[in-house]
């Protein structure tokens, strides 16, 4: 009986994923129609993103996952997205085994395999979404100025961190850090602005 439990759980999970895909399909269709009719507007996409972000419990996880599988440019079928978390742009990419904590905010980003996004972290679409006009006033977000950032495989973004640049594979961003410059793979960065702290894994020594 114990040997059958994993297969039973998998069957239940697969069935729930299918049911949730069906439940959100009309919502996803409205986003698709909006994109075609309005030449790229994301108002409907954001409306449903906010609606599904506040569904509690495991049902909410399944609904959010189903919604983004149908609306993002690419989205794996096995990832976790917590309560209050949402994507702000359809152009995001999500690889398998990614974890997105509660209240995280993800813009135009490519989330690598197995990366961890901590609670209340913000992944912004670069550093130049807004521009000053001739009168010195800041304008609204300009989609033409968005830059897709890359979070490398198995990187860890700490709670409350703000990331506006690429993060290398296996790198850890400390809680509350503000990252404006690219961080290479396998290191720890912390602070505002973020600074290199140390390597997370020493390179093997070669004997001569």
Where are these regions (language model features)?
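Terminal amphipathic alpha-helical/low-complexity segments used for targeting or macromolecular assembly
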Residues: 1-73, 136, 154, 192-208
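A short, terminal or domain-edge coil/loop segment
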Residues: 2-4, 35-37, 85, 132-144, ...
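Flexible, glycine/small-residue-enriched loop-and-beta-strand segment within the central core
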Residues: 54-66, 73-74, 83-95, 99-167, ...
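Beta-rich strand-turn-strand
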Residues: 159-172, 177-181
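Conserved beta-to-alpha transition
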Residues: 184-185
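Conserved active-site beta-strand element of glycosyltransferases/polysaccharide synthases
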Residues: 189
């Amino acid at each position: 009986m114990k040997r059958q439990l994993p297969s039973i759980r998998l069957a239940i999970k697969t069935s729930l994923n299918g049911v949730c895909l069906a439940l959100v399909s009309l919502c996803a269709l409205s986003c698709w129609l909006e994109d075609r009719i309005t030449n790229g507007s994301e108002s409907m996409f954001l409306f449903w993103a906010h609606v599904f972000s506040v569904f509690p419990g495991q049902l909410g996880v399944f609904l959010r996952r189903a919604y983004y599988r149908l609306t993002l440019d690419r989205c794996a079928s096995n990832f976790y997205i917590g309560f209050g978390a949402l994507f702000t742009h359809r152009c995001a990419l999500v690889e398998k085994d990614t974890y997105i904590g509660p209240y995280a905010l993800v813009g135009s980003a490519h989330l690598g395999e197995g990366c961890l996004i901590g609670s209340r972290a913000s992944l912004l679409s670069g550093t130049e979404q807004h521009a000053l006009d001739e009168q010195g006033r800041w304008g609204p977000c300009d989609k033409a100025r968005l830059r897709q950032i890359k979070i490398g495989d198995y990187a860890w973004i700490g709670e409350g961190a703000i990331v506006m640049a690429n993060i290398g594979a296996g790198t850890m961003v400390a809680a509350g850090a503000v990252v404006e410059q690219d961080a290479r793979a396998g290191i720890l960065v912390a602070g505002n602005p973020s600074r290199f702290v140390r390597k997370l894994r020493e390179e093997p020594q070669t004997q001569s």
